[in-house]
């Protein structure tokens, strides 16, 4: 037995390991397809990956930017990819309904909604569940995903007590409670290989030299989440009818891909995320497609209008084209 192995055994830490054996709970062993190629690229540096399967990912934005619909779309993708999988959805806003899930193709028998009011409630229930998973033999565990929608609406036990007593004082402990919660959760979720997706609100920083958005909840989430994406939207119209939103996604923080990268996705009110939206721009940026006057020139020299590509994306984004784009995406989005 080599020296490092002896030190690991002496520590009594069953999760410790040599780097060349893989880091249990830290290394990303898989990804969850988000339903959008360009959003996958933003999160993971590949069109074909997406949300890390053992990390905390946060979608942050102002009210009505589509954070809940975005989350439900990702939940649907997770359940579709994992026929035995389940989702635990912590709802702090009473924002979701049964219809919202079923309309997005989510199997209602495989998702449970947990209404919670305070950070302490969420922490206790979530940690109890994760500890139960960790106590279960790995061969008997089912794929699981946890969603918190949203962190920004969680109160604290102190704030609830102050309101009940008629006190009008600001809760100065909230940021610390949140920080402590995710300090514990982050490591346990990694060990249990459970991905967490959460939403949060942003607000304008008063007095900033340039317009600046800040995340709600203090600094705790910034350190806990592996990935934070800020969302902003504009209406998507067809024939003067609003059919959805065009959402600009900026990488606020990431441990896997380059920060401050930006992509735009299309969120349709009826069909959810458009898998192919944004690929034309990505292909142009990568040099796979070329702009030729009013048309797009494909690698084989064919020239077509962008409108036709968007109408039949599967015809033009063949497996070979997607592979070429993905190679460029990995160079552009990943570190090193």
Regions found by a protein language model. Give the residues of each.
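The Walker A/P-loop phosphate-binding site
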Residues: 2-110, 122-131
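Peripheral, non-AAA+ core regions of ATP-driven protein-machinery
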Residues: 21-27, 38, 242-245, 252, ...
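A short alpha->loop->secondary-structure connector
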Residues: 79-80, 104-111, 162-171, 213-218
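Catalytic P-loop NTPase motifs of RecA-like helicase/translocase cores
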Residues: 96, 154-155, 205-206
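Phosphate-binding/switch loop-helix module in NTP-utilizing enzymes
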Residues: 117-193
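Phosphate-binding/switch region of NTP-binding enzymes
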Residues: 171-286
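Long, well-ordered amphipathic alpha-helical subdomains in the mid-to-C-terminal portions
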Residues: 275-304
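Terminal-proximal interaction/regulatory segments of ATP-powered molecular machines
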Residues: 294-336
């Amino acid at each position: 037995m080599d020296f490092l192995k002896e030190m690991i055994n002496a520590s009594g830490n069953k999760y410790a390991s040599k780097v060349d054996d893989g880091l249990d709970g830290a290394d990303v062993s898989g990804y969850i397809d988000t339903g959008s190629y360009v959003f996958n690229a933003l999160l993971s540096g590949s069109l074909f990956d997406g949300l890390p399967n053992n990390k905390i990912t946060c979608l942050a934005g102002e009210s009505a930017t589509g954070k809940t619909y975005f989350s439900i779309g990702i939940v649907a993708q997770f359940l579709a990819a994992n026929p035995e999988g389940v989702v635990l959805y912590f709802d702090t806003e009473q924002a979701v309904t049964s219809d919202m899930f079923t309309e997005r193709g989510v199997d209602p028998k495989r998702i449970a909604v947990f209404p919670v009011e305070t950070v302490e409630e969420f922490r206790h229930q979530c940690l109890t569940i994760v500890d139960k998973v960790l106590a279960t033999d790995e061969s008997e565990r089912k794929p699981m995903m946890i969603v918190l929608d949203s962190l920004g609406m969680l109160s604290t036990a102190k704030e609830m007590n102050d309101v009940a007593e008629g006190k009008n004082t600001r809760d100065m402990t909230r940021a610390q409670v949140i920080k402590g919660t995710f300090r514990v959760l982050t490591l346990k979720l990694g060990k249990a290989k459970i991905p967490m997706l959460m939403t949060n609100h942003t607000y304008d920083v008063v007095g900033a030299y340039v317009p600046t958005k800040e995340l709600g909840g203090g600094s705790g989430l910034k350190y806990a989440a592996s990935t934070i994406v800020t969302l902003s939207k504009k209406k998507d119209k067809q024939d003067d009818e609003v059919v959805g939103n065009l959402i600009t996604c900026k990488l606020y923080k990431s441990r896997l891909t380059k920060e401050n990268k930006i992509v735009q996705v299309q969120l349709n009110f009826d069909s959810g995320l458009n898998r192919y939206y944004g690929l034309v721009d990505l292909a142009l940026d990568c040099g796979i497609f070329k702009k030729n006057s009013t048309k797009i020139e494909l690698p084989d020299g064919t020239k077509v209008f962008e409108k036709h590509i968007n109408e039949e994306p599967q015809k033009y984004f063949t497996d070979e084209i997607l592979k070429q784009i993905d190679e460029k995406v990995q160079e552009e989005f990943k570190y090193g």
